[in-house]
Amino acid sequence: MAKYIMAFDQGTTSSRAIIFDHSGKIVASQNQEFKQIYPKAGWVEHDPMEIWGTQIGVAKGVIEKAGINPEDIAAIGITNQRETTVVWDKNTGKPIYNAIVWQCRRTAPICDELKNKGFDKKIREKTGLVVDAYFSGTKIKWILDNVEGAREKAEKGELLFGNIDTWLIWNLTRGKVHVTDYSNASRTMLFNIHELKWDKEILEELNVPEQMLPEVKPSSYVYGYTDKSIFGVEIPIAGDAGDQQAALFGQACFKPGMAKNTYGTGCFMLMNTGEKAVPSNTGLLTTIAWGIDGKVEYALEGSIFIAGAAIQWLRDELRIIDNSPQSEEYALKVEDTNGVYVVPAFVGLGAPYWDMYARGTIVGLTRGAKREHIIRATLESIAYQTRDVLEAMQEDSGIKLQALKIDGGASANNFLMQFQSDILGVPVDRPQVIETTALGASYLAGLAVGFWNSKEEIEKNWNVDKHFEPAMDNEKREKLYKGWKKAVERAMKWAEE
């Protein structure tokens, strides 16, 4: 009996492979960063061949590192940076353009056009998403409109579209399988989340041929097998979910009202709403959490575009820290931010503001403002943005959050997590395994092949590593938060022509 599950965690800045055992513990992990391409201001791309190369490289590397054989792997689960768009030639297998990354703002004018026509209401109702350059639909349109010969090839059925999950599965099966799961499909802005199919009216409006699109399957399902030439054996590819939905699953947030926040490049908060798609009146997204056991479950999501990336900015651009963990050390050297607020709206603001033209802002500077204050204010901005999202979620769902489960790289920052608990006024729980994105993909894959039998079995694997209790009084909490709201106002609409 195969003893392990392998997860591919293909992220925005690195490709990672992790091997898990039956108790959900990490046996071995390997990751490799790849190149970020910035052709123009606000444009972000990746090379899909480099993504495939790094992903397969770490997969082979981690098998060796774990000292196991490929036949010891019961299944592969895939989780991915969502919305990032690849269009490739189905005969040559070569991309016709770089992958357009979720952070890329180049399609903002297309989005403005849709809004001016009033088509955004229709998109909101059908897909649960707001019209934004973030999602795949307008990115596909851009490629078809701007790459020479692309539209003709697409009409002839020679081109395929996929998000990163689809691109990896297509390559793993050597072109045999062109598939995605419900969670990833729900991020394209082309998928009707109520009827569970590609929406013809939206496809027509964006002029995207349906034949380019992958088949949509449950998130826990045997999609196909890896080609023998890759690992020497055929391994079932049995789990697929977008990174945030996978993290919700990995955190065992199986009941309505359970929520998690992932602190990665961006911050993503999801609340399970069960079999009901809850529409949002506060600018959150209604999205598919996963499809499993013959049914689909939904979630409310608030996306914060810049979280960990703000700490990278302190390190790489401002050069006021040498590494990310140092941010905690410096933040603790001062009592507070001395009235400084940083609004890291480098690529606009996500939920609940959705302002594509907001830009990064530092306010409240005085002669006494030091490096430590700016570092601390940058960390605090992550917690404030999370509170913005949580308030919107509670309003939409009518559910008051009891505790927040956390994961992702920056959740290891104890200063930030304590401040998060303080500013929310609810307990925050960090699990022992913070690689919950990869863990969720593993669980989905393992359930499909009988490696695990039920969600209940998985739930028993979840254990708390550190519990944070709010230690701030309400008056101080509200005063600080009011200052944040004022700072956000200053950042909004900055780049409008």
Swiss-Prot record:
GO cellular component terms given for this protein: cytosol
Catalytic reaction annotation: glycerol + ATP = sn-glycerol 3-phosphate + ADP + H(+)
Entry binding sites for sn-glycerol 3-phosphate: 12, 82-83, 134, 243
A GO molecular function held by the record: ATP binding
Enzyme class: transferase
Residues noted as binding glycerol in the record, renumbered to the chain: 82-83, 134, 243-244
Keyword Transferase belongs to the record: yes
E.C. numbers: 2.7.1.30
Activity regulation (UniProt): Activated by phosphorylation and inhibited by fructose 1,6-bisphosphate (FBP).
Pathway stated in the Swiss-Prot or TrEMBL entry: Polyol metabolism; glycerol degradation via glycerol kinase pathway; sn-glycerol 3-phosphate from glycerol: step 1/1
TM annotation in the entry: none
CDD domains, per the entry: ASKHA_NBD_FGGY_GK (cd07769)
PROSITE patterns on file: FGGY_KINASES_1, FGGY_KINASES_2
Binding site for ATP: 12-14, 265, 308, 312, 409
Residue positions binding ADP: 12, 16, 265, 308, 409, 413
Keyword Metal-binding: no
GO biological process: glycerol catabolic process; glycerol metabolic process; glycerol-3-phosphate metabolic process
Assembly and oligomerization: Homotetramer and homodimer (in equilibrium).
Similarity comment text for this entry: Belongs to the FGGY kinase family.
PANTHER family in UniProt: GLYCEROL KINASE, SUGAR KINASE
Function statement: Key enzyme in the regulation of glycerol uptake and metabolism. Catalyzes the phosphorylation of glycerol to yield sn-glycerol 3-phosphate.
Name of this protein: Glycerol kinase
